[in-house]
Design a protein with these regions (language model features):
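Mature extracytoplasmic/luminal segments of secretory-pathway proteins
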Residues: 15-16
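Catalytic core of non-heme Fe(II) oxygenases with the double-stranded beta-helix
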Residues: 98-199, 203-217
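Non-heme Fe(II)/2-oxoglutarate
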Residues: 27-113, 215-255
């Protein structure tokens, strides 16, 4: 391995090990805590989910959080047989997406369901529950919203996430998803026109700490960049990065 490459690798590793939470949570539109997954749903899957929502019986969204007075939406109950098919479509699509593994390090996923917001509905500032009463209990590390309505179909309804002193509004194309830490305070702004349909779920990660997940993602991105060089890729660099990734996973994983 050339001296320059070894020095570069050493600097890269030292930079990773020096990173702290403050550097990883700087608030801006490209914040590494927030992951935009494009084209999670295929067009036929999106159409099927919208058709299911059209014919399904929605109930008061407080069924899943009765103690939150600011939750004003509707959802298909997660224990309703009608939730099985859309839940499976959303789950399979998310696990199929190549960026989910790196971004979430998913260990388990709650049963997805569909939520609906009509004009006047919203979900005030809140933080998602830490544990879900499943068997066994599941911890929420990563919150997931899959957008089923195009932004032009409704006004308002932005998912608003607090990042330090900033608030990041998110309103994505139908079929796209956003992942964000379940530890963030967030809200859904009031819908003023149209209908906002979304799929929602939560992920328990093998790596509970968001900063550690981001470091592993940076290492994976570095490996991808090096592998993209093809025959010019430095095998020793790839070996070191792969070793670093695997050993940090062993160190941090709660498996």
């Amino acid at each position: 391995m050339p001296i320059e490459a070894r020095a570069s690798a050493a600097r890269f590793v030292r930079a990773i090990l020096r990173c702290d939470n403050a550097g990883l949570t700087e608030s801006h539109a490209g914040n590494p805590m927030i992951h935009h997954l494009r084209n999670v749903l295929q067009p036929d899957e999106l159409a099927k989910l919208r058709a299911i929502a059209e014919r399904s019986q929605f109930v008061d969204g407080r069924i899943s959080n009765p103690n939150h007075p600011l939750k004003r939406n509707q959802q298909i109950p997660q224990n309703d047989p009608a939730a099985v098919e859309p839940g499976a479509i959303l789950r399979d699509a998310l696990f199929r997406h190549p960026e989910l593994r790196v971004a979430a390090q998913a260990r388990n996923m709650a049963n997805p369901t569909i939520s609906r917001y009509e004009p006047g509905m919203s979900y005030g500032w809140h933080m998602d529950e830490a544990l879900f009463p499943s068997q066994p209990a599941m911890r929420s590390d990563v919150s997931v919203t899959v957008f089923l309505s195009d932004p032009q179909e409704y006004d308002g309804g932005e998912l608003m996430i607090t990042l330090g002193q900033h608030v990041l509004p998110i309103k994505l194309a139908a079929g796209d998803a956003v992942l964000y830490p379940s530890t963030t305070i967030h809200q859904v702004a009031p819908v003023t026109r149209g209908v906002r349909l979304v799929g929602i779920t939560w992920i328990q990660s093998y790596i509970p700490d968001v900063a550690q997940r981001e470091l592993l993602q940076q290492i994976e991105e570095a490996r991808t960049i090096e592998m993209a060089r093809g025959d010019k890729a430095e095998m020793r660099m790839l070996l070191l990065l792969g070793s670093l990734r695997n050993n940090l996973f062993r160190m941090w994983s709660d498996a």
